[in-house]
C-alpha cells in the first residue's frame, strides 16, 4: 500500500470518527428537549387540577328559616334586640327585629350579585306572607351587600373595609368576618360585621361630640 493511499484511509477514519462524535452529542440534546416538554406538560396538568374557587352564595349570609337570634346591646337602651328569620322563597327573606320598643321588618331580595332591601317598616306586628308576585313587584330601596367580596368594594355609601377579620362575640369567636363601614355627613361611623352562615353578627355606631366618643353596639349572643 502506498503512503498516499494509507494517508487517505486515515483521513476517512478520522472523518467517520468525528461524525460519530457529533451524533453522540446531538442525541442527549433531543432527550433534554423531550424532558423539558414532558415537564411543561406535567405543569399544565397540575395547574388544571387546581380547584376552581367556589361560587359565593349570598343567601348564606342569613340564618335558617325560623331562627331567633339575640343581640347584646351596649350604649343605648334599645341596642339589645331579637331578630327572627323568615324565608319566603329561595331568594327572598325577612328579618323581624324587636328591640323592646318596636318591631321593624326588613325584607331582602337575593340575586347572583347582591342582597337588596325591598321592604322596611316599623311598628310591624303581623306575619308578612306575600305572594311571589307581590315580592317581585317590590322595588329596591338600598343594597345590603354586593359582590365582589373584596376590600375596597363600595355601594350605597358603604365600603367593604375588611374581609378576613377575627371577631369575639358572646356567642363565639368568628374568623373571616366581613366588615362594612359608612361615614355620614356628621362624621358618625356605622359598621356592620357579617359572617357566612349567620349574617349580621355585630353592628356598631360611633360618634364624637366635643371631646366625648359615643359608641353603641349590638353583638350576637345566642341563636335558637
Predicted regions and their residues:
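Bacterial N-terminal signal peptides that target proteins for export
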Residues: 1-7
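Short hydrophobic/aromatic segments of transmembrane alpha-helices and their interfaces
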Residues: 7-8, 183
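C-terminal motif of bacterial Sec signal peptides marking the signal peptidase cleavage site
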Residues: 14-18
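Conserved functional acidic sites
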Residues: 20-224
Amino acid at each position: 500500500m502506498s503512503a498516499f493511499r494509507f494517508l487517505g484511509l486515515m483521513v476517512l477514519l478520522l472523518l467517520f470518527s468525528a461524525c460519530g462524535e457529533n451524533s453522540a452529542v446531538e442525541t442527549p440534546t433531543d432527550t433534554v428537549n423531550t424532558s423539558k416538554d414532558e415537564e411543561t406538560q406535567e405543569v399544565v396538568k397540575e395547574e388544571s387540577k387546581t380547584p376552581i374557587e367556589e361560587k359565593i352564595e349570598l343567601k348564606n349570609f342569613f340564618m335558617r328559616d325560623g331562627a331567633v337570634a339575640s343581640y347584646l346591646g351596649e350604649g343605648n337602651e334599645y341596642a339589645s334586640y331579637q331578630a327572627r328569620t323568615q324565608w319566603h322563597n329561595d331568594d327572598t327573606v325577612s328579618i323581624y327585629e324587636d328591640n323592646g320598643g318596636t318591631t321593624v321588618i326588613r325584607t331582602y331580595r337575593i340575586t347572583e350579585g347582591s342582597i337588596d332591601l325591598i321592604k322596611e317598616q316599623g311598628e310591624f306586628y303581623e306575619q308578612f306572607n306575600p305572594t311571589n308576585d307581590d315580592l317581585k313587584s317590590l322595588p329596591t330601596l338600598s343594597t345590603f351587600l354586593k359582590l365582589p367580596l373584596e376590600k375596597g368594594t363600595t355601594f350605597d355609601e358603604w365600603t367593604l373595609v375588611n374581609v378576613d377579620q377575627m371577631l369575639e362575640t358572646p356567642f363565639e369567636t368568628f374568623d373571616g368576618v366581613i366588615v362594612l363601614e359608612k361615614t355620614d355627613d356628621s362624621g358618625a361611623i356605622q359598621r356592620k360585621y357579617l359572617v357566612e352562615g349567620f349574617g349580621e353578627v355585630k353592628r356598631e355606631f360611633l360618634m364624637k361630640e366635643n371631646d366625648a366618643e359615643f359608641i353603641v353596639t349590638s353583638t350576637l349572643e345566642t341563636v335558637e
